[in-house]
């Protein structure tokens, strides 16, 4: 029986979800995370942002057909189909960008899924192995397949030389690497490169090309046939394209090392400034403090800071060029020291107080409610006072914190076959950061002898920082064993790694490596079983 006056174009809810899954970007709320943290420094920040690293949130068509947009996560990658043996977090694209990563990492927003994963070193490996932040391809099937040039922010015509780029920047980079042009910036090597001003300075444009990850080996074969017309492509194809580019670029490990060599100490310091994580907020518990409430606040804060610490480490030039195992070991060895030196820097202008967070400021006497923590508070205040006497500058703090990371591991970082290459890379990176610290001190206007004394004083304080971090680690482990406070997520993983490393310290180096490798394999098998 034919029903008249029935609109033939009426779509059922099921078909509506599929056909309307792609909406115009301009109709949805836009979330633009920023990797710049305002701080006290005397140099203008070098911004390496581009729309290629922006996340867009498109209003969902399901459950809200009346027109009101539903807030969605800015990290749609957790919605992608997994590869079978990996978790949704492991499907994040592995971007080669070092400088264009926003602070608000997608996997940080998806942390609610992490409690389903086994807590072991494999979790940290996945966080380091992934981009940890927005990659050039961030649109799932529910968004338009638009990309932007990582250099000038114009619409990208394809995937050229390892990054999404427009025809103009692709041609410019091709001419530059073929013609060996030695460009000179007429200004201060900080020219803004965007769609309208990309032709104003060739030197800064070429520098920007290298900074966003353009490499000579990223040939025209990696274009993936992308056109700027609104042609749909599945997320799996995009991930495959990026993985192919990373495999090709892996054959030229010297490219990123040459980029690090080309950075002056001033540029390296500015890069460390751009990598600084944001301030983390934690709600202050109701007064008065109890042992449980204070430890709960401190552990929650530490877990949040660890998330940002991984993103900070990956933005240090050359760190991601180390093997994944080396990155994991360095972070496992220094995370408490990095947290401690950050606490000291925040507290340097507040004598007698510890600024754990902008909304969590503690006096010395407030630590009396927690057994054993008062001694740690005294050590923190004493070392902070010493930094205050030296009038520690922000740029010196940036270099010192990076040195703590790179000089943290006391154990072999690789197997015998890889040890020489790994040691060379790490030493080269540590020397670059040390040179940057020497350059910062030289700009203070003091004599050469005073510069040497100041450098020695700063480096000697690092032993105090490590001593305090060891005390803090022991105290946190005791609180965990006494069940004073529950420890979850990344903080628990770091504590377990510290305990395992302490157990292995009495074992020979070969046995230690074999035990650790077997532990990593067990973690991988546990992930596959889930």
Curated annotation (Swiss-Prot):
Expression by tissue, per the entry, reads: Expressed in prostate, ovary, Leydig cells and in epithelium of the efferent ductules and of the initial segment of the epididymis.
Question: Phosphoserine-modified residues are where?
Answer: 61, 87, 105
Upregulation details from the record are:
Isoforms 1 and 2 are down-regulated by 17-beta-estradiol.
Instruction: Name the Gene Ontology molecular function terms of this record.
Output: DNA binding; nuclear estrogen receptor activity; sequence-specific DNA binding; steroid binding; zinc ion binding
From which residue to which do the NR C4-type zinc fingers run? 149-169, 185-209
Please provide the record's keywords in A-Z order.
Activator, DNA-binding, Glycoprotein, Lipid-binding, Metal-binding, Nucleus, Phosphoprotein, Receptor, Steroid-binding, Transcription, Transcription regulation, Zinc, Zinc-finger
Q: Which residues bind DNA?
A: 149-214
Return the domain comment text from this UniProt entry: Composed of three domains: a modulating N-terminal domain, a DNA-binding domain and a C-terminal ligand-binding domain.
Q: How does it assemble?
A: Binds DNA as a homodimer. Can form a heterodimer with ESR1. Interacts with NCOA1, NCOA3, NCOA5 and NCOA6 coactivators, leading to a strong increase of transcription of target genes. Interacts with UBE1C and AKAP13. Interacts with DNTTIP2. Interacts with CCDC62 in the presence of estradiol/E2; this interaction seems to enhance the transcription of target genes. Interacts with DNAAF4. Interacts with PRMT2. Interacts with CCAR2 (via N-terminus) in a ligand-independent manner. Interacts with RBM39, in the presence of estradiol (E2). Interacts with STUB1/CHIP.
The name this protein carries in UniProt is: Estrogen receptor beta
Question: To which species is this protein native?
Answer: Mus musculus (Mouse)
| Lineage of producing organism | Eukaryota, Metazoa, Chordata, Craniata, Vertebrata
